[in-house]
Amino acid sequence: MKNTELSQKKKLDRQSRRKPAKSCHFCRVRKLKCDRVRPFCGSCSSRNRKQCEYKENTSAMEDQLRKKYRRCSKLEMARRIEELESQLTKQSQPNIHEGQNPLSNMRYLSSKHNRHILYGPTSYRAILATQTDTFAKYREEIWQVLKLSRNNWKREHHYSTLSEISSIETAPPHSGSPSVIEYLCESLPNYEVLCEYLTDFFASDFYDSYQIVHKEKVLRDLQDCFVKGPRSHKTGQHTIISLNLDSKKNYYKVGVMTAIMCLASHPKEVPEAIEVFHKVLTSFVSAKVFYTERVQFLFLRYLYINVAGLDGGDQSHCIFIHGLTIDTAIHMGLNEDLRRLYLSKNHPIEEIPYLERLWLWILFTDVKISLSTGIPVRINDDFVNKVRLENYSSSGDILLYKTTLRLRNIMKQIHAREKPPDIPLIIEDLKKFTIKMFKPLDFYLNASNLNGNEFTELQLWHATLHMIGSLSNLYTLTHQDFDARIFNFSVLAPLNSLHLCFNVLETYFELDNSKLSSKSLCLSKKWPHLNNALFLIYVNAFRALIQIYTIFLQYMENKDIQLFIQRNSSALTYSICPGDFEGPHNKCISLKIAFKEMENIFDHIHQEKLKPLTQIWQNSYYFSIIISMEKIGRRAFNKGMKNIDEGPETENDATENSLTTILNDLEGPLEDFSENFIDDILGSPSAFFDTAISGWSNFEDFFSR
């Protein structure tokens, strides 16, 4: 008897405690310290995990709840849950500190059928949403009655707020032509080909760089939105015969996929039907289009404009599409705390990191367009919560985040009305920032270090070099007290941008070309790395050329600059080292050497070993423009460059009289340069264009080999 009692006692002793596990499953298994933040702890969030599960022993609590609420109906329980959720939402609002405006955080997100519109304190929707729960309950009951009357009126008068979107499904009257949707379905590739384009895109370094759309969601939309026809006996593939959307007609899901297809298939020509479809989607303006897919679609369109080299050279063709992207994103609250704002509306948690990253890229694009066009940034500081961005950006986005904020701050100083910017100090701070945050330029100029994963870093480096070059030019134009270091920055920053462009172009071409020699046929028509290099060339090469030519023109026209350069020229010949954008200390770099270095950059691309790559130059419109601009500049400035004196052989020779004599000797040739400029560059167009521009067809043929 005693043995039985002892055995039962041991069993009771071995029972585990009902103490809940506080750490999430991931941290508990890997023995990591869990901060227990929900819905994602710090460890899971930093690793971009899609799940963060907490296993809790709640059996005792469940028993108590069952006893307490066993007589409650489901309706009463649902109402109680809504009240408690509302209280939790209000409690989660950030505490209002003394002196802080309580209205600044008064936000209401109206969500309906996956459409989201954000309202602020002066909106009646936000005011009503802050009322008591009892008032909200009665408001819903009143709205249901009003909604019945409204729907009856709509049916009687044949009115629909979806008429704008529905127009895409209707053929123009008396035209005999198909509707936009019918035309689109006729022009789309087979379903399997479209699926392959999407798969290629999500496997590319380009997608890894941006990650603004959720891969699994897009692939689900692919299955849900397209209706496949019968399988072709010839190809074994299915044609797309129609689209399958819900009653709210979110065509932006399809737009995201067709925009991705355009990016993945570049440089193949985009069918006219897809271009028309994209233009129509872009033109919608009613409140029925506030889908997150609309913001993604507009930004993907912006990316394609840059990938195809259609930005106008200075982002001027991107201004309106960028404005639409900003307006839609802000009115949907993408600049807010999405993890609090959207989770209360049952928005999928796995999509929120992509929306946060999308807003971060929109901020960077705003700076990029502002820098290129010379206009202040469009996104006001009120929409940029710096602390929130720093908390929620993943480790891969930190460089993008910090570079964007640094460049935004510089643009703010440039356009300030009250205080002129201290340009030398700004340039020095930006140089220190690049040293701290970036790998050195030498790293990216070494082909062995490039594998395609550095695409984001290259974009940020180019933007930083553009800013340094622009500020240096501005200082030279607006200040009489010239500075040798500033002058060197203005020459070497765009030169290094050109070095970076063409080194990446050559290296990425070799990366793709090495795959072509393999037996894999699917890679024989794909140039993913080269397309990324073209993106950098289109956006940065033309701009760098113009910056360098601006320096040459300043020298030709401004005698003060001529005198300053002659007085501060280095006694020893200074050879330009790619990767160095500072130059000799307290001495001006020779313009002759800079001009020769630029010639070497462009001559290198025409070497025999790069002959396959030069075919791109011969058949691309944008490349032809760049080549022609360089040839025109080479011929126009070559005469002036020959007459530039290298400066005094010793510092003792740099007297005022000798400098005046040098400038007088230069005056004649420079006047000849100005008077005979047109004669110098006139000639047969073939002297500048390697071939007649024949559109993109030949360019496409080259890539399809």
UniProtKB/Swiss-Prot annotation:
Protein name: Uncharacterized transcriptional regulatory protein YKL222C
One Gene Ontology cellular component: mitotic spindle
PANTHER family: TRANSCRIPTION FACTOR PDR8-RELATED
Compartment list: Nucleus
Organism: Saccharomyces cerevisiae (strain ATCC 204508 / S288c)
GO biological process, one term: DNA-templated transcription
SMART domains, A to Z: Fungal_trans, GAL4
Domain of life according to the entry: Eukaryota
An MF annotation (GO) of this entry: zinc ion binding
CDD domains: fungal_TF_MHR (cd12148), GAL4 (cd00067)
Stored SUPFAM superfamilies: Zn2/Cys6 DNA-binding domain (SSF57701)
DNA-binding region (UniProt annotation): 24-52
Keyword field: DNA-binding, Metal-binding, Nucleus, Transcription, Transcription regulation, Zinc
